[in-house]
From Swiss-Prot:
InterPro entries: Ribosomal_bS16 (IPR000307), Ribosomal_bS16_CS (IPR020592), Ribosomal_bS16_dom_sf (IPR023803)
GO cellular component annotations of the record: chloroplast; plastid; small ribosomal subunit
Family: Belongs to the bacterial ribosomal protein bS16 family.
Domain of life per record: Eukaryota
Protein name per Swiss-Prot or TrEMBL: Small ribosomal subunit protein bS16c
Organism: Oryza sativa subsp. japonica (Rice)
Signals that turn on the gene: Transcribed and spliced in green leaves.
Subcellular location: Plastid, Chloroplast
Length: 85
């Protein structure tokens, strides 16, 4: 089973996160299948690869609660409805 979850990057006291598609059994810093986005909580910046996220969601990937909150803030689900219509 796949998950869309955050992978910590950056340095001490300056965390930046990549949104990755990863196997459930892998640890947080484990090998990811694909990087599908980027999130900087300090600058409050988000960069999403929408086609890649849609691909993994169609394959059955489940986003974690934090990733789904990030996607909701970026109005990803509204875009998804537009692309499906």
């Amino acid at each position: 089973m796949l998950k869309l979850r955050l992978k910590r990057c950056g340095r001490k006291q300056r965390a930046v996160y990549r949104i990755v598609a990863i196997d459930v059994r892998s640890r947080r810093e484990g090998r990811d299948l694909r990087k599908v986005g980027f999130y900087d909580p300090i600058k409050n910046q988000t960069c999403l690869n929408v086609p890649a996220i849609l691909y993994f969601l169609e394959k059955g990937a489940q986003p974690t609660r934090t990733v789904s909150d990030i996607l909701r803030k970026a109005e990803f689900f509204k875009e998804k409805e537009r692309t499906l219509s």
